[in-house]
């Protein structure tokens, strides 16, 4: 999947899960599982419940995503 195919949406982190996974709620009230992108993990970006994040969703599986940005 190329980066152009990904759907980027805003979300709020609901709860942290093991292995750098998070349950996030999208703007349209759907809940999906999201993992932290490699660059955020490399730079030790902390994500806490309540944070607003940008999530990339694959058009093939809309129940899983990748957290690509944490807003201040």
From Swiss-Prot:
<keyword id="KW-0963">Cytoplasm</keyword>
<comment type="function">
    <text>One of the essential components for the initiation of protein synthesis. Stabilizes the binding of IF-2 and IF-3 on the 30S subunit to which N-formylmethionyl-tRNA(fMet) subsequently binds. Helps modulate mRNA selection, yielding the 30S pre-initiation complex (PIC). Upon addition of the 50S ribosomal subunit IF-1, IF-2 and IF-3 are released leaving the mature 70S translation initiation complex.</text>
</comment>
<dbReference type="GO" id="GO:0003743">
    <property type="term" value="F:translation initiation factor activity"/>
</dbReference>
<comment type="similarity">
    <text>Belongs to the IF-1 family.</text>
</comment>
<keyword id="KW-0699">rRNA-binding</keyword>
<keyword id="KW-0648">Protein biosynthesis</keyword>
<feature type="domain" description="S1-like">
    <location>
        <begin position="1"/>
        <end position="72"/>
    </location>
</feature>
<dbReference type="GO" id="GO:0019843">
    <property type="term" value="F:rRNA binding"/>
</dbReference>
<keyword id="KW-0396">Initiation factor</keyword>
<comment type="subunit">
    <text>Component of the 30S ribosomal translation pre-initiation complex which assembles on the 30S ribosome in the order IF-2 and IF-3, IF-1 and N-formylmethionyl-tRNA(fMet); mRNA recruitment can occur at any time during PIC assembly.</text>
</comment>
<dbReference type="GO" id="GO:0005829">
    <property type="term" value="C:cytosol"/>
</dbReference>
<protein>
    <recommendedName>
        <fullName>Translation initiation factor IF-1</fullName>
    </recommendedName>
</protein>
<dbReference type="InterPro" id="IPR012340">
    <property type="entry name" value="NA-bd_OB-fold"/>
</dbReference>
<dbReference type="GO" id="GO:0043022">
    <property type="term" value="F:ribosome binding"/>
</dbReference>
<keyword id="KW-0694">RNA-binding</keyword>
<dbReference type="InterPro" id="IPR004368">
    <property type="entry name" value="TIF_IF1"/>
</dbReference>
<dbReference type="InterPro" id="IPR003029">
    <property type="entry name" value="S1_domain"/>
</dbReference>
<dbReference type="InterPro" id="IPR006196">
    <property type="entry name" value="RNA-binding_domain_S1_IF1"/>
</dbReference>
<dbReference type="Pfam" id="PF01176">
    <property type="entry name" value="eIF-1a"/>
</dbReference>
């Amino acid at each position: 999947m190329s980066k152009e195919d990904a759907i980027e949406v805003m979300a709020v982190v609901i709860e942290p899960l093991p292995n750098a996974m998070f349950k996030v709620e999208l703007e349209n009230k759907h809940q999906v599982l999201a993992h932290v992108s490699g660059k955020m993990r490399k730079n030790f970006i902390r994500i806490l419940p309540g944070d607003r994040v940008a999530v990339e969703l694959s058009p093939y599986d809309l129940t899983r995503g990748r957290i690509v940005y944490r807003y201040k």
